[in-house]
C-alpha cells in the first residue's frame, strides 16, 4: 500500500504526479446511457420529417417515432438531437473504438494529457476498452469506482449493505474493476438523485468510508436542485469524508444562485464546472432549469477565483452522447483547450488561474494520500 502514496493510479498503473499534465476531470469514453432514454412524441416527429417536394423522391414524411428513436445522427436531425439528446437511442451510446481513438487523438494533439473516465457501475463502464485507447494513444486515463444513479444500480445494490458496497468500491480501487486487474484512481461519479433514494444514501456513505481506506478523491453527480450539493456534502461529512477531496460535479446545471454557490464553496469541497460545450439552454433532464452558456461558466468561475476559491475548481465537458463528439458534429474533448482557454485569458484569467484549474488542482485531487 505504501508504494501508492504520492502517486496517481491510471488505467495502466501508478504514475508520478508530475506526469499527469493537462487533465479533464469528468469525461466518458465508453458509456451506455439507454436507461435514460425518453420516447419522442408526435410533435417532434413532425419537426424531423423533411418533405422533399413534388417528385423529389427525398421525402421522409412516412417516418415513425420508432424511426426517429433509432436513426443515426445526420444533418437533417442534428438540431433535434442536440435539443433532445435523450430521445435518440443511437446518441445515448459511446461504443465505437475507432471514433474514441480519433476523438482523443485530437485531445492529445491540442495539449491534453489525462482523461478522468468517471463511468461507474450501471452505465456500461468498460475498463478493457479504455485500456486499449490509453495504450494506442499513450494518454493517461483514470477510471472511476462506485455506483451511478438508483435507476441504473438498484438491481445490483438493493440487497447490499453499506459495508458490502464499501468493500466493493475498495476492491475496485485496490484489486481491480469487475474481473480485471485495472484499478480505479477516483471514487465516482457517485450518482445522486433529488431527492436522494435509500440506495443512493447507502452509496454515498459507502463512498465516504471507501475514501478513508483508499486515499482517493470522490466525484459526485448531484441531484438537480440547488440545495442538493449541500445535503450530499453533509452526509459525506457525517460519514467521515475529507471534503477537500470531494468534487461536486455538474455545478453549472445545478447552482445558479451566487450565494448558494459561495455557501457550497465554503464547505471546502471542489466545484466542478464540467459541461463546457453544452450551449443549448434547453436541458432535457432539468425541468424548468436551463443550461448556462460557456460565457456564463467563465464568468462564474472568475467570480469564484476572485472570492479566493481558485484552488477549488476543476473543469471538463462530461461528454456522454455522440452528438457532442467532433465525429458527429459536436465540439469534442478539445473544446476547452482550443476555445475556452483563449476566452478565459481575454476575460482576465491569469496563467496561474488556468494552470490551477487544468493541472495543479487535478494533480492534488488525484494524488493518493494513503
Curated annotation (Swiss-Prot):
One of its GO terms (biological process) is catabolic process. Keywords: Cytoplasm, Hydrolase, Metal-binding. It comes from the Eukaryota. Its EC number is 3.1.-.-. A divalent metal cation 1 binds at residues 26, 28, 189, 318. Its cofactor is a divalent metal cation. GO terms for cellular component: cytosol. The keyword Metal-binding applies. A divalent metal cation 2 binds at residues 189, 221, 250. GO terms for molecular function: N-acetyltaurine hydrolase activity; zinc ion binding. InterPro entries: Metal_Hydrolase (IPR032466), Phosphotriesterase (IPR001559). Binds 2 divalent metal cations per subunit. It catalyses: N-acetyltaurine + H2O = taurine + acetate. It is an enzyme of class 3 (hydrolase). Disulfide bonds: none annotated. It is found in: Cytoplasm, Cytosol. N-acetyltaurine hydrolase catalyzes the hydrolysis of N-acetyltaurine into taurine and acetate. Belongs to the metallo-dependent hydrolases superfamily. Phosphotriesterase family. This is N-acetyltaurine hydrolase. It comes from Dictyostelium discoideum.
